[in-house]
């Protein structure tokens, strides 16, 4: 069996891709070269139709592996607000009706929570990461608890970062959009999920 040299990160979202790459690079996976969907021959990508983040992440990783033959890691993530029964959940990216409309999604969520008192504004960012290779399928979940702010703050990140105030030491009540990339990478839901996935990735990097 040939040495695995490429790991396909199954994403076209450049901001998410940059974050995933930073976390994986910081882990020192020297046996793997990261490539994205922008680096491979285009293929039909299945819609995100799963009932859970895990369903969607696994479907994306399976599709990418089947189309390219490269070991593939995929992420599906979103925001779960307790006052909305865990929504927007898997609908996070299209909560306002248009996929990827961060401003619209954020504005709608704030409007839906406008009368919710501070003590009931708990929420969590959730990331499911799936790894599919010729010998293995692994799915993990990372959760980053926090609360929903009453208005957007900060200009970094993407998605709901400007209204999510994460729990964590030394974060000082800032939203994710106000954190430095290194701070986000050290606490985020994707970091937590990828940390759980790291043993499988290290095996992949060493496999011959």
From Swiss-Prot:
The active site is at 76 (proton acceptor). Substrate binds at residues 11-16, 77, 158-161, 184, 189-190. CDD domains: HAM1. It catalyses: XTP + H2O = XMP + diphosphate + H(+); dITP + H2O = dIMP + diphosphate + H(+); ITP + H2O = IMP + diphosphate + H(+). GO terms for molecular function: dITP diphosphatase activity; ITP diphosphatase activity; metal ion binding; nucleotide binding; ribonucleoside triphosphate phosphatase activity; XTP diphosphatase activity. This is dITP/XTP pyrophosphatase. Its EC number is 3.6.1.66. Keywords: Hydrolase, Magnesium, Metal-binding, Nucleotide metabolism, Nucleotide-binding.
